[in-house]
From Swiss-Prot:
Keywords: Cytoplasm, Methylation, Protein biosynthesis. It is found in: Cytoplasm. The keyword Calcium does not apply. The gene is prfA. Peptide chain release factor 1 directs the termination of translation in response to the peptide chain termination codons UAG and UAA. PANTHER family: LD18447P (PTHR43804:SF7). GO terms for cellular component: cytoplasm. It comes from the Bacteria. GO terms for molecular function: translation release factor activity, codon specific. InterPro entries: PCRF, Pep_chain_release_fac_I, Pep_chain_release_fac_I_sf, Prokaryotic/Mito_RF, RF-1. Pfam families: PCRF, RF-1. This is Peptide chain release factor 1. Methylated by PrmC. Methylation increases the termination efficiency of RF1.
Length: 360
């Protein structure tokens, strides 16, 4: 193992001892926020320190066995012990490398999911509805909560745009690689000749901003407009100005919300979406800066990238970033995303390990 990695592991082991001492103090719970912070740090450091302890024991075992090589009676035993210790060291080094990978601070957050119809007109809007159902079914399998924040329906029951909030354990970490262009190839219900059409939707997955302090929005930077809500085909049109449009002047980001009959609740929802979009813009700027020095295709999240194709006649779904093709489109559209999500996470981890090797 490289010296830089060993030095980092020594630092983490020392820090765990400090955290243990702080948690053992009689007044440890006097500041409950600090206590929770230390408890989280303890939970993060403990697995690393445990594996590092096993690694150091394997190093000691190797040194002891090597010292026995000069003894003719112990030579065979020592050779077996050396082989065993080296095997353990190799395995533990791999485990420690994964444990040292940088954690995404947003992984444990809830998320805001935006789906927008793109090329393909009404068929694209119908596919946006199919994608919403796919993600909703996946969320239900995880026992997550799904709340529609804003929707703009098309004439045939699809969505020109739909924004939902998904809340649940590590929701963002599971779906963060879904951002990008999703292409569909199928015979539309409106196609009389039976010809296959290609259309596309854009998906954006953004971590939900904290209620307080995560994204600073100055009230003077906001323009707030209210107007009457309008449903598809003129349905459920409110007679009061309950719909809200927020414009963030420094970034030009505009958010509308008209789903609720309460102007106050519409404003609250719009503020959540606005904060998520501002946070997302900041994250993507940081990622673009990082990408200028290292290309990370999986995590780029570029909305213009076509990341996946859903080919209904062939029954296949292909993720172009990792060249993975699965012939179970019906199951995937019904929310069975586990194989895709896990494969993308594994590829991202491999990218991180490669980067760790370059930087060490």
């Amino acid at each position: 193992m490289k010296a830089s990695m060993l030095a980092k592991l020594d630092q983490l082991a020392e820090r765990l001892e400090e955290v243990n001492a702080l948690l053992a103090r009689e007044d440890a719970t006097a500041n409950i926020d600090q206590y929770r912070k230390l408890s989280r740090e303890h939970a993060e450091l403990s697995p690393v320190a445990e594996q590092y302890g096993f690694y150091r024991q394997a190093q000691d075992d190797l040194a002891t066995a090597q010292a026995l090589l000069d003894d003719p009676e112990m030579k065979d035993f020592a050779a077996d012990e050396i082989a065993s210790a080296r095997e353990r060291l190799e395995s533990l080094e791999g485990s420690l490398q994964k444990l040292l990978l940088p954690k995404d601070p947003n992984d444990d957050r809830n998320l805001i999911l935006e789906i927008r119809a793109g090329t393909g007109g009404e068929e694209s809007a119908l596919f946006a509805g199919d994608l919403l159902r796919m993600y909703t079914r996946f969320a239900e399998r995880q026992r997550w909560q799904v709340e529609i924040m804003s929707e703009s329906e098309s004439d045939l029951g699809g969505y020109k745009e739909v924004i939902v909030r998904i809340a649940g354990d590590a929701a963002f970490s599971r779906l963060k690689f879904e951002s990008g262009g999703h292409r569909v190839q199928r015979v539309p219900a409106t196609e009389a000749q039976g010809r296959i059409h290609t259309s596309a939707c854009t998906v954006a997955v953004m971590p939900e901003a904290d209620e307080v302090g995560d994204v600073e929005i100055n009230p003077s930077d906001l323009r707030i407009d209210t107007f009457r809500a309008s449903g598809a085909g003129g349905q459920h049109v409110n007679k009061t100005d309950s719909a809200v449009r927020l414009t963030h002047l420094p970034t030009g980001i505009v958010v509308e919300c008209q789903d609720d009959r309460s102007q106050h609740r519409n404003k609250d929802k719009a503020m959540k979406v606005l904060a998520a979009r501002i946070k997302d813009q900041q994250m993507r700027a940081a990622q673009a800066k990082e990408a200028s020095t290292r290309r990370n295709l999986i995590g780029s999240g570029d909305r213009s990238d076509r990341i996946r194709t859903y080919n209904f006649p062939q029954g296949r779904v292909t993720d172009h970033r990792i060249n993975l093709t699965l012939y179970k489109i019906d199951m995937i559209m019904d929310g069975d995303l586990e194989e895709l999500v896990s494969a993308l996470a594994a590829e991202h981890q491999a990218d991180q390990l490669a980067a760790l090797g370059e930087d060490s």
